[in-house]
Amino acid sequence: YVPPKATPETFTKLKQTGGLETRYRWSRQHPMAAYFADAAAMPALLRFDAAETKSSGWANTSFVLSCGNWVFAANALMNPWVHLETRHQNFAAIEDGAEVAVQMVVEALFEKKGHQFADVRINLFNAISRAPLATIWQRAIYHLRS
């Protein structure tokens, strides 16, 4: 799959019809599972080897926010694009082995100084139960002025 080129028309269509849902699996094998040089320095809830807690190996914020970037890039071909601002809220832990369904809604489009901007709302769900996991609001420049 190659997404359509990022243009005002592409993002207007995404705003009207919605975008492609993407899925990602969180596990101890994921490259983001140990995002510190020393995994033992990570919070116990995020480590897979944490004996001091029964709840361990939960997805870290880097994975959650990356899901937002990945779905954004999966819906429109952008090169380059500039991630400007993010706000997010977690609703539930993403546990080891969870498949995460990610959906994006375009909330606003605007132009400033020749740059094309998009404000998007990204929602993460458990792919099986459809329980909400997190929400992300993101602002990005998807097309730099020529």
Question: Model regions: which residues?
Answer:
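Residue-identity detector for glycine
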Residues: 18-19, 57, 68, 97, ...
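Hydrophobic beta-strand-centered segment that forms part of the acyl-chain substrate-binding groove
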Residues: 61-106, 135
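HotDog/MaoC-like acyl-thioester-processing domains
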Residues: 1-12, 90-146
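Non-catalytic linker/capping segments at the edges of enzyme domains
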Residues: 1-56, 74, 143-146
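Generic preference for hydrophobic/aromatic residues in regular secondary structure cores
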Residues: 22-35, 82, 86-88, 100-102, ...
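Generic detector of well-ordered alpha-helical segments enriched in charged/polar residues
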Residues: 43-46, 65, 69, 139
